[in-house]
Amino acid sequence: MCAATGVAGAVAALSCGGTAQAMVNGVPVADAETAKWVATIDPVGDGSLFDTGQCGGALVGPDRVVTAAHCVDSVDPGRMKVHINARVLSRDPGVERGVRGIVVLPGYALEPSAVDPDDADLDSARNDLAVILLDRPVTDIPVLPVGVSRPAPGTPISFFAHGNTGKAVGFEDPEYRNDVLHRGDFTVMSHADCVAGLSPVVDDRSVMCAQDRSERPAASCFRDSGSPAVTEVDGRPELVGVFSFGGEVVGKGCGPAPQGFADPIAFRDWIFGPLDELEPYPAAAPVVHRTGESLHCDLPHWDEVRGRLPGTVSVGWANRTWMGKLPLLTPIAGADTADLPIADAARQPGDAVCVVSAANSGGVIRTVSEGVDVHD
């Protein structure tokens, strides 16, 4: 379910929240007036959106975007940028906004896959929704209304995303993801059919399933997570799903299988509520000082306007390397205090970074220092 590599694994991309998938066999959206409310979430906040955009979302109010909770899990809200109506990621970034706060839906949890319970990339999820509050309203793009009742089995829905294509090409090849916004057409399934096709662990209350059963079926792949699914009601689109997980939970990543969408309709009142339980928001990144043969990490202060104080804070260290323009963090074993011997940091490739995680009832964030060269 992760955008680049497993968050829980030995190597994690700074840009990766929890899970993130993308579309196979979708069709390009040619009409510039269609789906202008699609959001693209860039947790890195720097560089080409084609390279660093990781998840989708939907503008449901002038100042708020709905996405998947796993897209913002363990991400630094202070670095994140949200792009509305980015039609072509490489050259049309759309309307850009910063983040003034994030709230994860209470009860959000990952559900281990029966295929491999220890592989977090195969997890399904429950209550996989989050709201991103924008630093400034978006007033020139119509919002996407949230539906009022879950579509019945057999209802057609359309899914809009910029995810990976599933083609067997390298990360550096532009064919690996959909630069242009794509659409996939699915049909809503019953819960029983979804469980039969995916896993016994599908939460009916918070997950709606759909599948494309055509001869050339559209399916999810990496970087589609959080992207919106809509149905037409009285001639207008309404949000009925937020992409959460797909065939990867049964070992069919980027392949034809039922698709699990978090149900925003079930939590409509929460989405448009006061959202007081904001996740922690670092006022700045941690800072690393080099003193003799050791490194010391100064923890960040916390912005109490854009977030609530954390209930727990932990410190770790990692070596940072790069996959293209995406940073990859390899944790340094046993490094769980603010001080680190340089000799320990120099055992693996890459510069050393301090990683601070903080959590409260609104969610979990992770903020990372600038790198320090430990191999000179």
PLM features per residue range, with description:
Residues 77, 154, 349-353:
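Extracellular Ig-like/FN3 beta-sandwich strand-entry sites
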Residues 276-376:
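Ser/Thr/Pro/Gly-rich low-complexity disordered regions
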Residues 23, 39, 53-54, 58-72, ...:
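C-terminal subregion of chymotrypsin/trypsin-like serine protease catalytic domains
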Residues 24-33, 81-139, 192-193, 199-200:
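Conserved catalytic-core segment of clan PA serine endopeptidases
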Residues 1-66, 74-75, 79-84, 100-102, ...:
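Protease-domain processing segments flanking chymotrypsin-fold serine proteases, especially trypsin-like
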Residues 96-97, 125-215, 264-268, 366-371:
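Chymotrypsin/trypsin-fold serine protease catalytic domain
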Residues 44-46, 70-74, 85-90, 135-139, ...:
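Acidic glycine-/aspartate-rich tracts in secreted/extracellular proteins
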Residues 64-69, 154-168, 211, 230-251, ...:
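Active-site-proximal beta-strands of protease catalytic cores
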